[in-house]
Amino acid sequence: MLFLLFGGAVAGLFSGARLAQFSGLLLMLHGLASISAGLFACDPGCNPVEPSRDQMLHNLSGLVMFASLTLANLLRVYLARERLGSAGFSWFSLACLIVSLAVMPMMAAAVESGEAFGLYQRINYGVAAIWLGRLAWILTRMQRAPLAVL
């Protein structure tokens, strides 16, 4: 629910800036996918030979969560300079994006081996959560003193 509210706030904050608004919509999509992933539980072991409908929907929701947050992060690599005037956050966004994408092959290998998928998933999502927290902090500061603290 918080992703929906935050995404809506981001979209509303940048009226007239389509890419910035789109990044907010992506955060909202991430929120909807998070709800969906919670509604559709994993099968025991989370990787059965014949997954249930719930498992497939859970996996699809997880994919949408990853894709929407990754794309929002990618947009902010550009938008941090363009809309926030923050080269630092642009570089931070790029670093988070690289780490998030670098973990993906490890996650894929973990699916094949059946070991440590959750670890890589948490690293990936942890980096995304840190990035999102930093974005929220910057936007909060921007509301108090536009661009002065960035």
Model-derived regions: residue spans:
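Hydrophobic, aromatic-enriched alpha-helical segments typical of multi-pass transmembrane helices
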Residues: 1-143
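Short, Lys/Arg-enriched, Gly/Pro-containing loop segments at transmembrane-helix junctions
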Residues: 143-150
